[in-house]
């Protein structure tokens, strides 16, 4: 890294770190008794991490340590339930999901098998403590309201919620969320949902294949608030095709007006570069995404949100990171 940096005249914000969770390294050093200043110096000198990113990693490691300390590592466990369907596949996405239209006649079969597995797991985990539940995907709200009820009812009947600390449903795309589905969620102890616009620029939503409008995002968010959801996350992506730092600023202004309880900002992971014609985009986007990331951090601070988790991916645009902010 040092040699390449010298030859090219370039440095990377995360230096030579390539792992998914750079906060793990910071946490290991903190748990070993090093001071915050010592950990920062270590990351900068040993791995070439910039001072700004070292401070970010340490701050998040400290918060993660406090949050993870609430979990029971001996008897506790977390449950993840995956719904591998989406209304359509976004151009930038490489997650394991399929368009609902291709599998619509098999969703009931999938749900039946999934519920059977949940009941079996509930029997095996009877003596353990369920700490957190996360229903993700895909897009969980591609399930119809009746199907969503069956899933949530099966989970509730299969596990004790006595030790449950968080129950998240990644409601996801506004074009799959309805008031009826939100009402179903309210019948169960769901504590957190995620409404994910990715951008508030209509031109970009159309370009990447998301079949909803900016107004749809706002309408669903307000409907969730009216129904009593008091922990709503929103996801954004920095570096979507055709977007500028100015577009990101406008998106963030609209998000601030909604005032979500947490915000997750992803730097675009270019895994399907050929589809976008973006092989060069990883290099070209560095300065633009840097501005977007900085604007996001400032917007989060204005909303009273602090960074609490961080992870990185291979081929991430600009060699940046994904950061979650919460109150």
Label every model-predicted segment.
Residues 4-11, 31-79:
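N-terminal [4Fe-4S]-dependent radical SAM core
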Residues 1-37, 41, 279-327:
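Auxiliary Fe-S-binding modules of radical SAM enzymes
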Residues 6-7, 45, 187, 226, ...:
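Residues at alpha-helix termini
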């Amino acid at each position: 890294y040092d040699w390449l940096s010298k030859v090219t005249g370039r440095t990377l914000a995360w230096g030579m770190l390539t792992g998914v969770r750079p906060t793990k390294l910071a946490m290991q050093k903190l748990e070993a008794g090093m001071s915050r200043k010592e950990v920062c110096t270590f990351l900068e000198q040993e791995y070439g991490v910039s001072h700004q990113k070292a401070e970010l990693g340490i701050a998040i490691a400290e918060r993660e340590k406090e949050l993870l300390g609430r979990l029971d590592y001996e008897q506790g466990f977390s449950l993840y339930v995956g719904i591998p369907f989406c209304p359509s596949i976004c151009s930038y996405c490489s997650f394991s999901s399929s368009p609902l239209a291709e599998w619509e006649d098999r969703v009931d079969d999938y749900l039946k098998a999934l519920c059977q597995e949940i009941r079996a797991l509930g029997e095996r985990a009877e003596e353990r403590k369920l700490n957190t539940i996360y229903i993700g995907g895909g897009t969980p709200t591609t399930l119809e309201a009746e199907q969503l009820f069956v899933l949530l009812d099966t989970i509730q009947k299969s596990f004790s919620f006595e030790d449950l600390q968080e129950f998240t449903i990644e409601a996801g795309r506004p074009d799959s969320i309805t008031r009826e589905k939100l009402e179903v969620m309210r019948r169960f102890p769901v504590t957190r949902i995620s409404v994910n616009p990715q951008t508030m620029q209509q031109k970009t939503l159309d370009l990447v294949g998301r079949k909803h409008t900016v107004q749809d995002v706002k309408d669903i968010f307000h409907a969730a608030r009216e129904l009593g959801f008091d922990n709503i996350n929103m996801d954004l992506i920095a570096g979507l095709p055709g977007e500028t730092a100015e577009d990101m600023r406008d998106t963030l202004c609209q998000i601030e007006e909604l005032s979500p309880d947490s915000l997750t900002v992803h730097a675009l992971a270019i895994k399907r570069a050929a589809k976008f014609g973006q092989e060069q985009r990883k290099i070209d986007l560095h300065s633009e995404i840097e501005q977007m990331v900085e604007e996001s951090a400032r917007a989060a601070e204005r909303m009273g949100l602090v960074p609490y988790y961080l992870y990185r991916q291979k081929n991430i645009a600009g060699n940046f990171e994904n950061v979650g902010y919460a109150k």
